[in-house]
């Protein structure tokens, strides 16, 4: 099974924040009381504990994104797909949530696929970065990320981190140059 966090938060507007986060556990057959307790703990980890009884429309976009993060991470699934998960967050919150997610990924053994355009996020969170071209689904480079765990805020200060970011950037630049010469998928190559 796979949990998905789409770019939009997709929160249920008539449920409280806590019940939105608990929803996947309840749908999987868990007791509502236990699911709500786990949801509250996840919300506390994202500095949203005091907003657990609020409705989604009472939160900022960044807060709703963090609620969606908590819900996705509590979903009982063997794999997780995060589509631009940090897009709605300001720079400071983005760094905090990235550190929070890095901690969770270090603790869990679930396969996690993160779709992002942010090289720093990819290098901090991934074990492997797959560089894709403008042609959908075409992988042009695979870069192993050999950074120590756990990967918190200090990771972004390591020389190796910056070297890996440069390597990913070079791969993206080379991919972009190749794609421009190849044309778009709809163009004829006669």
Task: Describe the residue ranges of each PLM region.
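Catalytic "switch" loops of ABC-type ATPases
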Residues: 7-12, 118
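Conserved ABC ATPase "signature" region
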Residues: 26, 33-51, 103
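Hydrophobic anchor residue at the start of the ABC signature
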Residues: 5, 69
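Helical segment within the ABC ATPase nucleotide-binding domain
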Residues: 94-109
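Short coil-to-helix segment of the ABC ATPase nucleotide-binding domain corresponding to the Q-loop/switch region
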Residues: 15-22
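A short, proline-enriched helix->beta-strand linker immediately N-terminal to the Walker B motif
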Residues: 74-78
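Conserved ABC ATPase signature
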Residues: 55-59, 63
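Catalytic Walker B motif of ABC-type/P-loop ATPase nucleotide-binding domains
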Residues: 80-83
């Amino acid at each position: 099974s796979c949990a998905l966090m789409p770019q939009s938060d997709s929160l249920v507007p008539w449920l409280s924040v806590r019940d939105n986060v608990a929803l996947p556990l309840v749908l999987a057959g868990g007791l509502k009381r236990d699911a709500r307790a786990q949801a509250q703990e996840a919300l506390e980890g994202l500095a949203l504990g005091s907003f657990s009884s609020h409705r989604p429309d009472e939160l900022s976009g960044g807060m709703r994104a963090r609620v969606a993060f908590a819900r996705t991470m509590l979903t009982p699934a063997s794999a997780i797909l995060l589509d631009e998960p940090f897009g709605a967050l300001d720079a400071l919150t983005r760094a905090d949530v990235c550190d929070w997610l890095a901690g969770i990924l270090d603790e869990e053994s679930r396969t996690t696929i993160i779709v992002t355009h942010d090289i720093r996020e990819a290098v901090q969170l991934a074990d492997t970065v797959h560089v894709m071209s403008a042609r959908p689904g075409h992988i042009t480079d695979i870069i192993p990320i050999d950074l120590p765990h756990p990967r918190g805020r200090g990771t972004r200060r390591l020389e190796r981190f910056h070297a890996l970011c440069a390597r990913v950037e070079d791969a993206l630049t080379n991919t972009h140059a190749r794609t421009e010469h190849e044309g778009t998928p709809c163009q004829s190559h006669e």
